[in-house]
Structure formats: C-alpha cells, structure tokens
C-alpha cells in the first residue's frame, strides 16, 4: 500500500493527498518507511486514524480508496470515489473503478460529472435490497443464525 501511495502522490502532484491508516491496521507499517514516504512526497499528509471519516470526507475534493468502506461513506456525502479494490460498490455508475494507477488519468470526465441526490438515494436503495439481516464480526447465536439463513437463501435462488 505504501508503494501505491508513493505512485499516487507522484501521479497527481502538486495536489495534496491525505491518507488515513485503517483502524484495524494501526501501526502495521514501519515508521521508517512512512517517514521516507513523507520526505519523498511533499504533497502527502497523514491523518490521525482516530479522526472520524465523515469529517475528512466532507472536506475532500474526491476520495481514492483501495478497498474501504470510506468509499461507501463518501457516496453518502455526494463525493466522487475512485476505487482500485474489490469493493461491493465498485460497479456502480457513481464510482470510477480502476484496475491500475494508469487508468486514473482517464478520470477527468467522471470527476466533472455532478452526482444528484436521486442517484445517491437509488444507490443506497439498491444496496439495501441486496443486503441481509446481520452484523459483520458479530458472533452471537442470533447473528450466526441470520448469516446461515442468508447463505441458504442465496443458494436456493441459484
């Protein structure tokens, strides 16, 4: 991921890039490598991982994500999202999905397009229709049962 950030910084220089470490991965990058990255890229800033995503997203021009729910949150706020990962929302017309950084150069038209409130409502409505009851990482008996029922329903629909 640090290599990705380094290439992204160079690609869109002089625009400033703000990165936030994933809360589940705090401290997983070597401090020395992060310092080198900051030294080599004057347009890079690091945000404290405890800062609320919505506060960051409200102030960004657009969001670039490898694979994070932050992209989903950015759509909620009407922001453009460029994703490089296998997110559940990558095929939406509200998202610019890129397989590699060279495709980022072709994002100008996407970034100029206005996102309407109706498109945002439709996006979340569509996602809600495809979701199942339950919570990620909840191992309670009722949640496990909900998960099991979801799998059965999917298998019965195929």
Regions found by a protein language model. Give the residues of each.
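Catalytic donor nucleotide-activated moiety binding site of glycosyltransferases and closely related
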Residues: 5-49
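Short, well-ordered loop/turn and helix-capping segments at boundaries between secondary-structure elements
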Residues: 14, 62, 87-90, 110-114
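Hydrophobic anchor at the start of a short beta-strand
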Residues: 15-17, 81, 114-119
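Short, glycine-/Ser/Thr-/acidic-enriched flexible segments
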Residues: 24, 70, 88, 102-103
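Short low-complexity, flexible loop/linker segments enriched in glycine and/or proline
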Residues: 33-35, 63, 96-100
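A donor-sugar binding/catalytic signature common to diverse glycosyltransferases
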Residues: 48-96
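Leloir-type glycosyltransferase catalytic cores
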Residues: 94-158
């Amino acid at each position: 991921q640090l290599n990705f950030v380094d290439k992204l910084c160079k690609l869109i220089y002089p625009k400033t890039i703000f990165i936030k470490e994933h809360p589940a991965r705090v401290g997983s990058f070597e401090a020395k490598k992060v310092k080198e990255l900051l030294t080599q890229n004057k347009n890079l800033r690091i945000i404290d991982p405890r800062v609320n995503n919505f506060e960051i997203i409200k102030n960004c021009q657009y969001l670039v994500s490898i694979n994070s729910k932050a992209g989903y949150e950015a759509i909620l706020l009407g922001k453009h999202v460029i994703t490089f990962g296998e997110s559940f929302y990558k095929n939406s017309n509200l998202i610019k999905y890129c397989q590699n950084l060279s495709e980022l150069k072709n994002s100008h038209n996407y970034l100029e397009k206005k996102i309407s409130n109706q498109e945002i409502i439709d996006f979340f409505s569509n996602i809600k229709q495809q979701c199942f009851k339950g919570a990620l990482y909840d191992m309670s008996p009722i949640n496990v049962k909900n998960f099991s029922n979801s799998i059965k329903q999917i298998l019965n629909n195929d």
